[in-house]
């Protein structure tokens, strides 16, 4: 039945059968002053008298104090820092922390993305894994209990493992971190998800103007051949295996590297601790 075939009576009948008595809305558009409107009376504003000319004793003390000009101090690497050879190809740079009981210990390897473009991928993948003895969550929980932290960074020319925390927990932290990094266990499912995320992020950066300007600057400075050499294609990223990436992490400890310590322990004491817990290759490459 078409709409045109319905008469007025049909529509009224349908409405009476199907529409409830209260199933409607009424809108009135009335002009004039609304006598039912309720307003809140404005409160009386009390002016605040200020004493702009008054000065407190503290202000007088600050204004009358004599401030000595700052004098620049420059680091003397021969006096402010000590050097010691821990093993062949491994040097310790030491500076004493006179302020508190916190330490910062870093291991710097001269291997970065310019030499091996997969290093940053290996770092990101390793950060998602557990070891033979600990899951990632268990490792994080133990680091938390020791009030310590670890961070691995990869730059163009260097890879750095940095740990920091309370000096009293240094030995336990070193043992935990080294045992964890040397015994990472691969997971193909995690690697698959990481590759997907990495490639998706790379694709999204193509639409970022700042990233494109930075890439253009790199191209102008170093040329296309260098950019190709230090940048993995999507196919090369897909071809990376878990074993290849974890081997890159493990081989770091076979390289010559620099150890930097800033903390309250003496040079002799920290040298013994590092030698005890930091396995170093007999013939580093």
Question: PLM features: residue spans?
Answer:
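A small/polar active-site loop signature that marks catalytic segments
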Residues: 238-243, 248
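His/Glu-rich zincin catalytic helix
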Residues: 24-142, 146, 162, 175, ...
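Conserved short beta-strand edge segments in small beta-sheet-based binding/regulatory domains
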Residues: 186-193, 284
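M16 family metallopeptidases and their MPP-like homologs
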Residues: 1-5, 25-28, 98-127, 131-183, ...
